[in-house]
């Protein structure tokens, strides 16, 4: 399955909407988009995961790298609206504690740090 990635500026945040399966084959596509955003100084990112049907460890590593990069630049990474299976992977891996996760994109965009579990 393919992956689609779209971005939208919302205030000082960039919403990165991801759809499809995020795995070893598709993670580089998302990583390239993130790298482009960071090069443009966009360091406040919300990943809309509502349409991500699957995420493996390669996909998780993309979010961890994004968090490390944005933290170094004084920014933030927030995850929004993960489907049950993706949320479960975040919980089992312990990343739900590290990657701020919100039930909706609107909550992720408007929330102050830290996030809800």
Where are these regions (language model features)?
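Acidic phosphotransfer microenvironment of two-component signaling modules
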Residues: 84, 106-107
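STAS-typified acidic loop motif
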Residues: 3-32
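Intrinsically disordered or compositionally simple regulatory linkers and C-terminal tails
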Residues: 110-117
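Conserved catalytic submotifs in the C-terminal HATPase_c
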Residues: 10-11, 50, 106
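Residues at or immediately preceding the N-termini of alpha-helices
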Residues: 27, 105-106
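Short acidic-hydrophobic, aromatic-tinged amphipathic segments that line or gate anion-handling sites
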Residues: 100-104
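A generic structural signal for alpha->beta connector loops
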Residues: 2-4, 12, 74, 98-99
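Amphipathic alpha-helical interaction surfaces in cytosolic regulatory modules
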Residues: 22-99
